[in-house]
Amino acid sequence: MICVVIMRHQAWQSDGLPLSSSSNEACKLYDAILSQYVTWRNDETLGGIEGCITSIKAADPDFVMGHVISTGLELVGTGSSVLRDERLASAVRRTVELADTQQLTSREKNHVKAVQLFSKGALHKACEVWECILADHPTDLLALKFAHDGFFYLGEQTQMRDSVARVMPHWKPHMPLYRQIKGMYSFGLLETRLYDEAEKMAKEALSLTPEDGWSVHAVAHVHEMKAEVEKGLNFMASTEKNWTVCDMLACHNYWHWALYHIEKGNYEAALKIFDEQVSQRCVKSGAMLDIVDSCSLLYRLELEGVSVGERYRELLQVTQPHSEDHTLLFNDLHFLMVSLGSKDTGTTQRLLESLQELAKDPAENRQLQIAERVGLPMCQALLEFEQRNYRQAVELLKPIKQSFVEIGGSDAQRDVFSQLLIHAAMKSGDKEHQQLARCMLMERDAVRPNSPLTDRLIQRAHSLHA
């Protein structure tokens, strides 16, 4: 059972974060939703996040921050798009309309503004607004977590780290969820390659809260990025009972566990985790993080020459409804892996054509603004690789390989695209491409020494190019 610290209306006011609602119940539920979001853990005694959202609307239907957190969470989840989901678009409009008719604090008004900007795809502008909130209210945890997620989607790794660093001195050990701030900062540290500092910070958090799934996740990343396979396997196994209680993150942590097995060449073990954990959790939750993890795991295995059977077709049932959402290019690329793996040319065509059409008039949408330069070439490269046009795949990816970060996600998640370029370059008949593959493998070996996967790829390159 999760320990949710329930704060009443007066407590929020005492902390300098007043909530414009006359309902103590609504304020308590707001706190419960925020706590579950930050801890990645649904509290079933409260009905989970969904149950709390239903209850908060009943307690105070006009509570603006209740609408901000419920609508904001759906937007940040990236599983729905206002372009295709009128219910979500209506929820955003309702939030703005309520704010226009009430006397709110400037902090609350800025929260509404940020949610509206995020709904338009203006993630960078939304993050600027959340940062403005944090400048005056450094303990506003909703602004901090939304900004953290926003910077993650933008690939703004330094900002993701520094956004937390700027507010940490204002957080004290007695404050609710203080421990989770350490985990957030740890993730920012590791995404800026400060691995030792990241591991130290995450383990400090875990010494206080062993079931902190996000800090477990940070340590898993450190071992992945340093190719510390045995350490990673032992760590995940020894802490499994702790982090599986974080139901919104457990699937992703199993994904990390499977990556160690792929790194080691234990493909059957990786498939076992996919079948018993990742796939089942993905279907059950429908959460976008779980979906892209499933896509990525199958694709990585195929790059290694592993047959995944009918798994792509089964996963297509989950990804297909999202093929024209276009909330994030990162998501689109993963959906494309599945439609290509399933040989579903219709879904592939719809995804590419609809993205091309939206990219013609991106407006404020940051993802669509970079689609033509980064996203669409990456999509086309996946298609060319699937059709064994390796030379074309390399020509598409090589000029933008330093721009992969702009699609968002973590270094570990985006590594699949670096692997794709290496495989395409190795298989290309072009001598310059083959040289590129060898150079990328040397780069990889320098920053991740003792990587079994890199060693295998180097051996493969030598045998192909001998």
Curated annotation (Swiss-Prot):
SUPFAM superfamilies, per database record: TPR-like
Record-stated family: Belongs to the TTC38 family.
TPR repeats: 175-212, 251-284, 368-400
Stated name of the protein: Tetratricopeptide repeat protein 38
PANTHER family (alphabetical): TETRATRICOPEPTIDE REPEAT PROTEIN 38 (PTHR16263:SF4)
Gene (UniProt): ttc38
Top-level taxon of origin: Eukaryota
Keyword ATP-binding: no
Keywords of the record: Repeat, TPR repeat
